[in-house]
């Protein structure tokens, strides 16, 4: 079962100790409203900082503490005017991406604080997102939930390993992965493996496993339409062997998701990898339930 996104929440207050004491209730009320709305909605787990940011020291300490707790992203909440440098320090030491949130309250300059903090982050080259409005409104809450879900997706990619069987297919630039960009943007390690490994491993698949799969397919799919040339029973058995080989190579190499070039080396001289694409992406095969593994072919970038 997939986990929920985890969103860290950090409230920002005035940097003057006396003013902070006067306004902390307003700032905390804004934080509490966001937390209560997310908890009632149930789609996002929250980790709330135990105190409000009102100094350089607390900005660094509290943002680092949220990051250590494994949040996918951090929401900065503004109920009154907070010194923008606090947000800059928190962003430099916390876990991004960052969502700046303020209510549209004419009595207090939370919106002004959010805009000033956003300007500070822009000056530092720190990309961020903003949401303005009452979190009790569905459209505002939905923006926060969507942000958290996207942040979880990006966070989950960090440290993953992509297995690239073969290289660019059919001359398509737009379907070719840049190893440097994926590592820089997502933290994904791209491991190149030759398609000949599929052929080698396919020859080692036991005949009884091939026949088991063949019988399962012919008995359970809606129709298997053989012909005398491109799709014979033996060709289906070859496709089964290739799927079993890809499944084993994926497990042995610790790949989280994969791509297979296929055209034209595999499709012309051995078989297409369509059956592999179908069952690697499914939560089952002839051996029963299994974890899906994203496979694209030809080697189209799956992101």
Model-derived features with residue positions:
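An N-terminal assembly and electron-transfer interface module characteristic of large anaerobic redox
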Residues: 1-303
